Amino acid sequence: MPTIRVQEADFDLGAEIAALRAGRPQIGAVASFIGTVRDINDGSGVSEMELEHYPGMTEKALANIVDAAMQRWDLIDALVIHRVGKLRPEDQIVLVAVASGHRGEAFAACEFIMDYLKSEAPFWKKEQTAQGARWVDARVTDERALARWGIVTDNASAATAQAASANDQNQKDRDA
């Protein structure tokens, strides 16, 4: 049974993986991802990030994401822990861990869950910078990552989409 937790408290990777594996000799692979707060985003220094969520709705959305992964891959178990509240650079934000009999399924499912979570999980992020507070929009690159799994969304703002398109063109110009 997958575990979903939304919490303010930090988590211990070693303890969480040990709990996921305990008493399950059929597990041949565990893949995990930890996301952390960066000290810079979109060219501005970030001193703090505040994550908000809608209790109940967020956990249900995360459970649906994990269920989608469980249907796509032969997983033994999965774990998602997402922190909320005020976080500082280097703090852990999210842990995604999946257990399977084989590494290929574990890696793919872990990446799928994280791609899906970045675009579809109902969290709201506010960053504190030297210029003041700003809300963080969904990124077009996150939507592109999710689209490779056959899931199309439109959560990124038009401004974010235009900026990503301009960045893509600039990269093409540099590569030419």
Curated annotation (Swiss-Prot):
Transmembrane segments: none
GO MF terms, alphabetically ordered: molybdopterin synthase activity
Protein EC: 2.8.1.12
Pathway per the UniProt entry: Cofactor biosynthesis; molybdopterin biosynthesis
GO BP field: Mo-molybdopterin cofactor biosynthetic process
Pfam assignment, any one: MoaE
Binding site for substrate: 36-38, 102-103, 118, 125-127
Domain of life (superkingdom): Bacteria
This protein's record includes keyword Transferase: yes
Catalytic activity: 2 [molybdopterin-synthase sulfur-carrier protein]-C-terminal-Gly-aminoethanethioate + cyclic pyranopterin phosphate + H2O = molybdopterin + 2 [molybdopterin-synthase sulfur-carrier protein]-C-terminal Gly-Gly + 2 H(+)
SUPFAM superfamilies: Molybdopterin synthase subunit MoaE
InterPro entries: MoaE_sf (IPR036563), Mopterin_biosynth_MoaE (IPR003448)
Enzyme class: transferase
Keywords: Molybdenum cofactor biosynthesis, Transferase
S-S pairs: none
Keyword Transferase tagged: yes
Role of this protein: Converts molybdopterin precursor Z into molybdopterin. This requires the incorporation of two sulfur atoms into precursor Z to generate a dithiolene group. The sulfur is provided by MoaD.
Similarity annotation: Belongs to the MoaE family.
Assembly: Heterotetramer of 2 MoaD subunits and 2 MoaE subunits. Also stable as homodimer. The enzyme changes between these two forms during catalysis.
Protein name: Molybdopterin synthase catalytic subunit
Gene: moaE
